[in-house]
Amino acid sequence: MDRSRRLAVSLGLNAGLVVALVAFGIRAHSSGLLADAGHNAVDVGALALSWVAVRFALQPPSAARSFGNHRATILAALGNAVLIAGVTVLIVVDAIHRLGNPQPVHAGIVVVVASAALVVNGAAALVLNDRSGDLNMRAALLHMVGDALASLAVVVAAVVLLLAPTATWLDPVSALVVAAIIAYQAVGVLRSSVAVLLESTPSDVDLDHLTDTIGRVSGVGEVHDLHVWSLSSEMRVLSAHLVLTGHPTLEEAQVVGEHVKVAIAGPYGIAHSTLELECERCHDDDVDPCRMEGAEPPVTIHHH
């Protein structure tokens, strides 16, 4: 199942769940169920946003967007993180209010409905778990995992309420537990999204190690002006200047460039690289690099 369909299935499951949670939350006077409903309502919007982003990112590059729309999924992930933060505040405010004004809770209804919500959220999480590492899908998956954990917290609180009906404070406390889970998710997604948008070096890429890898390629004497960043969760880009040993022909320089691309593609996941190739200086006091035979330096190799 492709990502678009995974998101659509999860969207449908959660839309139906929100209606049920609101209806039974009001009937049972449960802030836990209403908090769960609020979280799921935000998730419906978040899943819709993720679905639109996936569809948008599939569009081919154009003259206006030469790299395509890969950043759309990152923007969706960032938007989801903001939505998560917003719903967290609302849940905390409501829970604090109910702690000061406890209401009787129909724990039996809460147990049944929250258990059903746990099953639905768990199923939605399994649908979204494509193990791709895509930030947009990760954000959507975290929404579902958070929902499942939130439903579990509500179930536990309701079971305790069945055994101790006077412990009405447990219901709003379960809502605060939900809020804590949601906030934790938001921080991780927000941090990763901002890192991509700021074109930070991917966290698993060591620039010194990458420089050594490139430097070990036959024909490469020096590496400088090295940059690595991400267009999306799955597309990494590199640009670098390489000083080649000796005075290679244009064809020989191109072969070195291709060998470098092969060396970095697999281990570092770099799908798009631009290499500017330079010659060694003929003498230490030379200001300009030597000219390659049959070519004007510098030679740029552009690779998709």
Where are these regions (language model features)?
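Alpha-helical transmembrane segments and adjacent TM-loop junctions that form the membrane-embedded core
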Residues: M1-R5, A28, G32-L34, G38, ...
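First transmembrane helix
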Residues: A8-F24, A123
